[in-house]
Amino acid sequence: MAFWDEKTLAQMNTEEWESLCDGCGKCCLNKLIDDETEELYYTNAACQLLDNKAGHCKSYEQRFNFVPSCTKVTVDNLESLTWLPDSCAYRRLLQGRELPSWHPLRTGSKEAMILAGMSVAGKVTCETKIRDIEDHIVLWPMKDVE
């Protein structure tokens, strides 16, 4: 039985917790909230540290030094991070759902995740190159595939 099936999120050690992250990069996308409806919108504007080709952070260990607003996902704040996509392993497990078939912990690589269209790799623009972020609202980050 896999550790994510045996343990609660709170019981996981640091290595297990970190391995739950599939590296999709969706959490690194700029998000907008409509002032009137409070609806959340994802954009294809990515954090300046996101590697567009690989779809992951170029400076993960030092990211808070460069981007102080970067959010560290923890067991203590997970429930309040309602902007995490439905495909996020942390969110899925919190909701009592399984890891999807494409998750790197199940497949051994990120290839299935990329083939399932779950990675931001090749789909984003660096936030520093965008003028009007409202023109960059996209729906694909909300996609969730079992």
Swiss-Prot record:
Top-level division of the source organism's lineage: Bacteria
Family recorded in the similarity comment: Belongs to the UPF0260 family.
The name this protein goes by in its record: UPF0260 protein Spea_2441
Chain segments annotated as transmembrane: none
Lineage: Bacteria, Pseudomonadati, Pseudomonadota, Gammaproteobacteria, Alteromonadales
Pfam families per the UniProt record, alphabetical: CxxCxxCC (PF03692)
